[in-house]
Amino acid sequence: MNEKLEEKIRESLSSVLPITIIVLVLSITLVPMEIGTLALFLAGAVLLIVGMGFFQLGAEMSMTPLGQGVGGRLVKGKRLPVIVVVCFLMGAIITISEPDLQVLANQVASIPNNVLIWTVAVGVGIFLAAAVLRILFRVSLSRLLMVLYILLFILSFFSPSEFTSVAFDAGGVTTGPMTVPFIMAVGIGLSAARSDKEGEGDSFGLIALCSIGPIMMVLLLGIFYHPTEAVYTAVEITPVITTRDVVYQFVEAFPDYTKEVIYSMLPVIGVLVVFQILTGNYRKRQLIRMSIGFVYTIIGLILFLTGVNVGFAPVGNLLGTGLAESTFQWLLVPIGIVIGYYIVKAEPAVQVLNEQVEDLTGGAVSRRIMNVALSVGVAGAVVLAMVRVLTGINIYWVVIPGYIIALALSHFVPKVFVGIAFDSGGVASGPMTSTFLLPLAMGASTAIGGNVVTDAFGIVALVALAPLIAVQLMGVMYEHRSGTVPQLAEELSDDIVVEFEEEKE
């Protein structure tokens, strides 16, 4: 166990170290910082590294087997109303627990937190149920996505313009470290228990559909709720001068994030307890292992969220402000490329996705290749976001052509890549995006006198869009190179079914 934890921490070190070095270089060149603020950032980086290590191991031990077990049992029960109700409730409950959603709700000042949170949760619940029905009835993911995105853009034209960016960002932040491991595992369990040659390809796509639900529901909220404006609350930067101030900032925030994470995990643990009472699905040894996994997950999330919110968010705002106020505003674009390329590696849910992709494709799509594809995509997204900050161009000029390209590609790549790509979009836009990239864009927009709501907000949506294109282009290259992945998908689906059935005996 200790060896596995050390391995996960080493992996997280390699993920967080590049972005830490980038900020250090900027702090001694273009954007000088006070020593206290820099110390806050470095302490946050340490917490990120350790927290990611604990979280990845914990999710592997607890969330993944729970999701697979629930998904498999739902299919075997063959009761459609039960499947729909259970999936809706699970989607809504886990979304309410998502830390990223709490961050978003706090930033949208004009909508009461509970209204926004419950609206988004209902959206995820509805679309998780729809995603499960898609797997069971073998509906084409690419066709379903095309229909839903057309409806989405039609709906967006009837919603107030202030809500467009808010809505698209809501789709990105709701699929974070809490929801991704569980929802992906449910998909694996469902498709494995389906026992057919296309099961493995259909194990992806749940996160993609769950990301659409919040966008649609927030757009509807904008139409019917009629708030006066969707203003965001800026990041508050507390003066930090001495090392005592640094320690105090973390000590003060630690209980809040501990409470937040424990409240977030309680519904998931409740699902395990109820599921075990009703089905007796897990042996005693498995339950002990899963319990330890939940403890690791809680520790990891507390450390990660404390580090990223206390250490990273203020620095992101300072970097954006400093670069925009300098005589070299255009440096926001090349620096955005570098930050975007490396920051996605520090998203905890990304590593969970990459591991599951590598496992399910038998190594044909490795973690390294997935990391490169996601990094290139997010780098492009941050560049577009910085261009929007500097020029004020409408988000529609980016997202509409982007989704047209992504949906067009979905008809020319192996089916497994479509699911992976659209899932990657939701996964890439996690807490690092909402607590570092968003403050970066907001700081820059404020410094140049732009409209923060329409110009800076939307960066999460662009980060969620970019992997859709990047990963599918990777799929095109794979198909032209050897055609290995589609064949592998058929072989793997049988292997997964055998392993799943053996566990149940």
What do these predicted ranges mean?
Residues M1-S12, V16, G67-P81, S195-L206, ...:
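Intrinsically disordered, low-complexity non-transmembrane regions of multi-pass membrane transporters
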Residues I9-S15, A39-A45, R73-V82, L141-M146, ...:
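Alpha-helical transmembrane segments and their helix-start/interface "positive-inside/aromatic belt" motifs
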Residues A39-L40, G58, A105-I117, R134-I150, ...:
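Transmembrane helix-loop boundary segments of multi-pass membrane transporters
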Residues G72-R73, L80-L151, Q329-S410:
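Helix-loop-helix junctions within the multi-pass membrane cores of secondary transporters/permeases
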Residues I237-A349:
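Transmembrane helical segments that form the transport core of multi-pass membrane transport proteins
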Residues V25-A39, A59-G67, I93-V108, F127-R138, ...:
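Transmembrane helix-loop junctions in multi-pass membrane proteins
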Residues A131-M146, E162, R194-P239, M386-P401, ...:
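Juxtamembrane and boundary regions of transmembrane helices in multi-pass small-molecule transporters
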